[in-house]
Structures are given as C-alpha cells and as structure tokens.
Amino acid sequence: MKRKIFFIIINISIVCFLSVILEICAHLVPAKKDLLGDIVNVLEEDSLLFWRQKANLRTMFQDFPVETNSLGLRVNRSAYQQMTGHTFKIVCLGASPTFGWAVKYEDTYSCQLEKMLNDKYGREKTYEVINAGIIGYSSYQGLLFLKRDILKLKPDLITVAYGLNDVDRHRFFRSNGKSDKELKPKNLLLVSLENLLNRSLFFRLCKNFIFKVESARTDFSGNWGDIYFGKLRVSAQDFRRNINEIIRIANQNRIKVILVKIPINSASFEKKILIQQAQHDIALSKGLDYLKEKRINDAIIQFKDALAYDSSSSKAFFYLAVCYEMKKEPVIAQHYFQEAKKMQAVQLRAGLEVYNGIIEEIARVKGIPLADAGPDFIRNRERKIFATPIHPNNEGHKIVAAVIYDAMLRYNL
C-alpha cells in the first residue's frame, strides 16, 4: 500500500514538474499580434453573463496599461483614494467605449467626469465615478450585470451607454448564431474549470495549435454558414425592453439615470465610390456560386474582385477565409477571418443609428436625461477624436464626459 502511494506521489510530482517546464517554455515562445487573442486574455467566462473582465488584472491592452479591481472593473490602483464623508456615487455602464479602448484610464470619460465634478463641487460633497464598462457587453448583459453586481455598489446615479454590441452577431464566448437572450446559464463548475485551464499559456497555445482555424472561425461567428443570416445579439424590440428594464430597476432602487449616446466614426464608413457597390455584389454572388460548386480557386478570384470594389467588405474577407481553410492553408485563412471581424464593424453603423433612435425616444417619453455626444462629435470632426472607427480617443472621451456633466447640471442631479 505504501509503495502504491509512493508511486502516485512520484507520478504527480513528475506531472507537476513537467507542467512547470512546459509553462516556462510557452512564455519563451514569441507572441504574435492577435486582436481577438488580446481581448480574450482580458476576459474570462461567466456562467450568467457569458464573460466578465478578469479580476485584479494588471496587464497591457492595446498598448495601454489596464488594471482591474476585485469585480473586474477598470481602475487605477496607484491613484486610488479612499472616499470620505458624503460621497455621491456614479456608475458608468457600457461596453468597450466606456471601458476605454486604447486610452489610458485617466483619459476615460468616467475618470474625466469625476475630476470635473470634484473640481467644481469638491468642497460641498465628493463624487466617485466608477467605470463599469465591460468589453463586448450588450444591453442584455448590462441588465443582468446591473441586477447581479452593480446594485451592490449602491450607486446614486448610473449612466447607460449600450447599443454598439447589440447590433453585432459576434460574441467573444459562446458565439453560436443565437441571440443573447436565447443562451442559457452555463454550468458553473465547467466555467470554473475552463477559466482555470485558460490561465495556462501552454494550454492556450496547445488549444490554438490544435484548433487553429476552427477556433478562429468559431471565435468569429460560431457557424460560418449562418453568420450573415443569423440573429442580431439583441433585436431592436429587446433593446428597447432591456433599456426600459434598466430604468425600472434603477427607479425601484432610487437610482437616477442618464442615457448616453456615443457615436461611431461615420466618416470612416463612407463608400468612396458608391457606383462600385453593384460590381462588388456581382463578384460576391459569383464567388458564392463557385464556393458551393467547390471551385475554390475561381471563388477566390471573385472574392478578391469584390474587395477591389469594396475594400471594407466583411463578407468577401470572410468567404476568402473559408476558401483558404478548404485549401488547407490555415495561416492565410486565419488572417482573413481576422480581417472579416475588423470590417464587420462597418455594418454596425446603420443598426446603431436605429438603436440610438430608440434611446432618444425612451429619454423623451420617460423624461430621462439624455447625454448625446453626437452633435459635439460632428462639430469637432476635423479633430482626431477616434482611436478606432468605433472607439473614441482621449479627446472623444473628454467630449462624452462634458455632455454627461452638462446633463447633470441641466437636470440638477
């Protein structure tokens, strides 16, 4: 019996030793630039919310330092000050534009708003503004997040800025073509195990190597055949319902609400030569016909022709990736999958305008304060105010902070 236990201990020790060695070796492998990989490294799965930002994180993301607290909310721990006396607490709900994509924490609109308020009213009361922006969140996730986590913070006021991801068809986890509300909570034990394994760089490298193209395709859409015909993450009707429910819950808990509209860079989405759209559609249609017939090389020619007419065609990039996957060229396929995801942002514009219209309507009907950054963004369009086509830079965040500040003054909040 003792001999058996001894061998078990020896085997476990060997496995642990080899695991440590392999993990060290994995960290010596040169890292490739991978946007989706960078995003997922900041996130982890969540049973109810699909994902959350990792707690107590300290890393670089999009070339800027990112730190999170125990709730996974973005903070600057080195500059944190304990609030004393009467503190008016504001929580900024939203997605990556609220989180501060490609900007320093000090430049996020939540941080700038806190400074503006304390500079003006600091002698009377203290303002604490919490950045509760979570990368990739829709209004559906925001509603669940409010109920499960944010109410515990006991905010006096929340700002609500959703819509950007509601009109998308992609999720960073569990992207399977279904809408957000159709996903059931995932087994908590399974989620915990997956998160534990994903902490290992060696495990992630092995997973990426084994499922290289498949994981890229799954991360992008879940099912490539249905991606452009699948459901939006949140329909317009459900978006309206989610925002109204957020307002109802806030009112029930005596929390004031400001709805926020953050525009995207419309100028970057304008077609340079509109007349070429027809040629793009023809080439894309021919390519799809060839793809169905397994005439892969002919399909590639047509999809590249489509890109010549519209260089932002997410569909052309996507189906090029499918072609190269079928040709057993995973590196090229993954490149085109990545490009397809980037260009899919182009398709957000029309949908986001509809959802922003819903926000305006709700604010008008319910008498909810609206902080609309759109007009100020248009007035400042000659300046550089975007870090990416869908994310404001530090100057853009300054504008958003100012319109929220003005809304607070107008409504005496």
Where are the regions a protein language model picked out?
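A conserved hydrophobic secondary-structure block that centers on an alpha-helix together
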Residues: 122-151
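Short, amphipathic alpha-helical "lid/cap" segments that border enzyme active or binding sites
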Residues: 139, 143, 236, 240, ...
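Proline-aspartate-enriched helix->loop->beta-strand connector
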Residues: 150-159, 164
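Helix-to-loop transition at the C-terminal end of transmembrane segments
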Residues: 24-36, 268-269
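Conserved beta-strand elements of the Class I
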Residues: 89-93, 130, 158-160
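Serine-dependent acyl-ester chemistry module
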Residues: 107, 123, 163-361, 365, ...
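Membrane/wall-proximal cationic-aromatic binding patches
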Residues: 31-124, 380
